[in-house]
C-alpha cells in the first residue's frame, strides 16, 4: 500500500483543478449526499455498491485498468496470479477488462479451456477487490461474419424483427450471456457485478452495429432490446450498462450524445480514446466526458486507450497521469498486451517487464491519485453519502 487515506486524499485533491475546469474536484462539499439511479431497479446490492463507489472515486483520482491483464501477458499465458502490471509495479490493476463474445456467439464451444481461464480470471479479480468491465466483439448474427463484418445494413433491423432467424440467433447468444452472468460468482457466493459495454465504439463504421450499418432509431432500439431482454426476460441484475463511443479526435459534450439511448437506459458514460500522445485531444475529451457525467449523474471513465507498440519512456506520467489529474473520471483502461512469447510483434498497449517505460509506470503508480488494486476501498460496500436507486 502506497496510499494515504481516501478522506485526506479528497482534501488534498480539492485544489488540484484549475479554476476554469468546472468538471474537476470540488473545493467544498465533496461529501454532499447524492442520489444515483441505475437502469435496473432490481440490481443486486453489490452492483449498487459498486456503482456508488464508481461515482465516489471520481473526486479522488482514477483507477488504472488493463484488458485481459490476468489472463495473459507479453510472454506468458494462463499463469495463475500472472499480470504484466503486477510484474512491473508489484500490484494488480484496479480494473480488469475482458471480452466475453467468444462465450456466447457461434464460437461458444470452440475453445473451452480459454473460456474457463477467462472466467477464472474474472473470479480472481473480484476476490481481490478489483472492478470488472466487459466489451463484446460479438459476431454478425445475420451474415455469420465477425463483428467487423459491416457488409449489411440489415442486421439490427433483423434482430428487432420478432421471430426472424436473426432475432432467434441473437436471443440465443443473449441467453448464453445471461447464463454467464447468473453463474459468475465470487468465493463469497455472491454474483459478480460487471460494467457491461455492449455495442462499443458505435460512433465508428467498422462494426455491424456502427454508424454506417444502423440508423439512429435502429441503434437505440437495439440497445433497449438488449437491456430489456437481459434485465427483464433473463433476470440479469448484476450488470451496469455502459455506453462507450470512440473519441480519438477532439470532441464536445454534444458528441457524447450521439445515438444516446436515453438517460434511463445508460448507467455509465465511457469513451474509447485512442488519441495517441495528443494530450490536447485527451484533455478536451476528458473535460467533455466529465461534464456529461456531472450533468447526468452517471460515473464515467476511459474504457479503452493506449498506443500500440509505444516506446516512449515517459508515456505514463506525461500522456496518462498528467491529463487525468484533476478530472472527474473513475478509470482509465489500456488495451491488451498480446501473448507474444518470442516478442516479435508490437501488439501491446501497456507496460510489461523489459519495456522502456517501466520506471515511468512505477512513478505513475506511486502518485496519490492513481489507484491500483491494493489502493481500493471495498468497492462492493456502499460509498458514504451516495444513494443508488
Language-model features and meaning:
Residues 23-101, 110-113, 363-389:
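N-terminal module-boundary/linker segments of secreted carbohydrate-active enzymes
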Residues 219, 231, 242-258, 266, ...:
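Non-catalytic scaffold segments within catalytic domains of secreted glycoside hydrolases
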Residues 103-228, 232, 236, 335:
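Substrate-binding cleft of extracellular glycoside hydrolase catalytic domains
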Residues 65-67, 197-199, 223-254, 298-311, ...:
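Aromatic-lined carbohydrate-recognition surfaces of secreted/lumenal glycan-active proteins
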Residues 49, 76-85, 116-119, 177-180, ...:
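Alpha-helical scaffolding within the catalytic cores
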Residues 96-98, 256-279:
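Aromatic- and acid-rich polysaccharide-binding/catalytic face
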Residues 14-19:
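C-terminal motif of bacterial Sec signal peptides marking the signal peptidase cleavage site
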Residues 58-69, 299-389:
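Substrate-binding cleft of secreted/luminal carbohydrate-active enzymes
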Amino acid at each position: 500500500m502506497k496510499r494515504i487515506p481516501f478522506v485526506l486524499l479528497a482534501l488534498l485533491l480539492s485544489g488540484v483543478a484549475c479554476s476554469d475546469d468546472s468538471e474537476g474536484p470540488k473545493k467544498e462539499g465533496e461529501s454532499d449526499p447524492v442520489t444515483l439511479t441505475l437502469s435496473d431497479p432490481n440490481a443486486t446490492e453489490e452492483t449498487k455498491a459498486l456503482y456508488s463507489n464508481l461515482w465516489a472515486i471520481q473526486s479522488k483520482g482514477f483507477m488504472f485498468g488493463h484488458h485481459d491483464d490476468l489472463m495473459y501477458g507479453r510472454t506468458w499465458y494462463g499463469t495463475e496470479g500472472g499480470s504484466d502490471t503486477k510484474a512491473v509495479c508489484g500490484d494488480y490493476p484496479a480494473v480488469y477488462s475482458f471480452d466475453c463474445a467468444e462465450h456466447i456467439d457461434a464460437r461458444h464451444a470452440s475453445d473451452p479451456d480459454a473460456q474457463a481461464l477467462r472466467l477464472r480470471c474474472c473470479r480472481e479479480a473480484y476476490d481481490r477487490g478489483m472492478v470488472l468491465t466487459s466489451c463484446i466483439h460479438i459476431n454478425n448474427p445475420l451474415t455469420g461474419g465477425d463483428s467487423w463484418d459491416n457488409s449489411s445494413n440489415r442486421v439490427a433491423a433483423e434482430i428487432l424483427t420478432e421471430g426472424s432467424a436473426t432475432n432467434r440467433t441473437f436471443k440465443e447468444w443473449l441467453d448464453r450471456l445471461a447464463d454467464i452472468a447468473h453463474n459468475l460468482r465470487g468465493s463469497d457466493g455472491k454474483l459478480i457485478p460487471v460494467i457491461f459495454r455492449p455495442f462499443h465504439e458505435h460512433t465508428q463504421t467498422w462494426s455491424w452495429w456502427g454508424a454506417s450499418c444502423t440508423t439512429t432509431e435502429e441503434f437505440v432500439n437495439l440497445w433497449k432490446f438488449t437491456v430489456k431482454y437481459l434485465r427483464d426476460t433473463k433476470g440479469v441484475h448484476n450488470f451496469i450498462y455502459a455506453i462507450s463511443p470512440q473519441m480519438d479526435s477532439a470532441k464536445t459534450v454534444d458528441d457524447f450524445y450521439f445515438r444516446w439511448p436515453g438517460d434511463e437506459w445508460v448507467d455509465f458514460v465511457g469513451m474509447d480514446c485512442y488519441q495517441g500522445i495528443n494530450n490536447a485531444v485527451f484533455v478536451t475529451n476528458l473535460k467533455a466526458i466529465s461534464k456529461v457525467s456531472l450533468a447526468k449523474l452517471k460515473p464515467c471513465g476511459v474504457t479503452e486507450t493506449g498506443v500500440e507498440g509505444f516506446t516512449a519512456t515517459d508515456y505514463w506520467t506525461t500522456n496518462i497521469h498528467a491529463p487525468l489529474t484533476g478530472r472527474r473520471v473513475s478509470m482509465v483502461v489500456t488495451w491488451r498486451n498480446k501473448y507474444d512469447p518470442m516478442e516479435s510483434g508490437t501488439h501491446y498497449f501497456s507496460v510489461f517487464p523489459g519495456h522502456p517505460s517501466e520506471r515511468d509506470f512505477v512513478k505513475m503508480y506511486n502518485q496519490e491519485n492513481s489507484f491500483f488494486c491494493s489502493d481500493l476501498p471495498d468497492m462492493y460496500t456502499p460509498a458514504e453519502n451516495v444513494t443508488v436507486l
